[in-house]
């Protein structure tokens, strides 16, 4: 498998967790290091570390039913053992409130930038998700 294929597979694994609800894989694809950081397209919008990112991704993916995503126009730039991936990202699903037994359809049209490092496999070192709608 080429580096480009491995990199896209890591990013797809992140979003596939929303479909499969296999959130254990999230710890495998993120760089567990103090240098890790992320910005989300959902609140809270502050800069997050590894642990907060994992917890919020787990919460997001278990709270959204019928989750789907589409990666469009990915641009992968590899610089030795680092890579930058920029893309358009569309996400849909039903945000479920299990206490109130209600659901709200959500759709996020956005952009995403990922920085990955190879140590020895590709891991996500930074995520920046942003909405371009609503």
Residue ranges and their predicted role:
Residues 3-22:
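Short, aromatic-enriched amphipathic alpha-helices that serve as compact interaction elements
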Residues 5, 23-78, 88:
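A solvent-exposed, acidic/Ser-Thr-rich amphipathic alpha-helical stretch
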Residues 30, 89-91, 128-131:
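Short beta-strand segments enriched in hydrophobic/aromatic residues
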Residues 46, 93-95, 132-134:
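A short local loop/turn or secondary-structure capping micro-motif enriched for an aromatic residue
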Residues 63, 92-105:
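Short, cysteine-centered beta-strand-loop-beta hairpins and adjacent loop/turn segments enriched
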Residues 65-68, 79-83, 102-108:
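A generic structural micro-feature
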Residues 81-97:
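A short hydrophobic beta-strand element
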Residues 84, 104-134:
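Short beta-strand edge/turn micro-motifs at domain boundaries
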